[in-house]
Amino acid sequence: MLAAPVICASAVWVAAVAGCVSTIPGVPRVGGDRGPLSWGPDVAGAQLADVLLDVAQVNQIMGTSAMTVLRTYDQMPGDDGTYSDPTCAGAVFNTVEAAYKGSGYLATRSSDVSDGGGKHYVDQGVVAFGSGADARKFLAASQDSWRRCVGKHVTYNAKNDSPITWTIRAPVTAGGITATVVDQEAGDGYACAHGITAKSNVVIDVSACSNGMAEKGVTVASTIINAIAGKFPA
């Protein structure tokens, strides 16, 4: 979605909060051999909302209590701006039409959670495909795209806000999850972690932003994804 860059543009930059990531009990820790890729029954579009985290879980992971739900989506939001490099838009932002167009996805559900000032922001999305094979195909294509975009500077030009440029770091894959960090240029340390995986017939695609995210981004993205994956039907 495109809410993250808009919120970041208006945020008042603050110092990084060290060690603010917590672990949800029962969720595999990042870096282990266990990942979310165990295959269960397919998830229907009507079930997607059930696997998203509630606001309390998001607050716990992000180490705050001030975040609330800004909006939820049951459609892929259309791009209301332009990218300097559309082929890398999917590496910077999660669940954007520029990345999913032509993929054959069937349904999507996502929610934006923020503290209102942009200090902490999470966009969690789940996208259903017709089969597990289709979901894994999209995951593999995304992984290839992210690797090709390493080091690139991607500017998003929103219709009603100032342009924001992001620099893409090298992705890391562990436990079935691929995650990268994108740094906001001239953002005083503000960065977003972007993580993606596939479980059953669903792609889990999340973004988490805050100051200091560069140091902990892979862990944050993986923790959110594992928590979502843990809510899938067995």
Locations of regions flagged by a protein language model:
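A short acidic-to-branched-hydrophobic micro-motif
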Residues: T108-A140
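Short, well-ordered beta-strand elements
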Residues: V122-V126, T197, N201-S210
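N-terminal export and membrane-targeting signals
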Residues: M1-S10
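Short Gly/Thr-rich strand-loop-strand
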Residues: Y73-M76, D144-Y190, P233
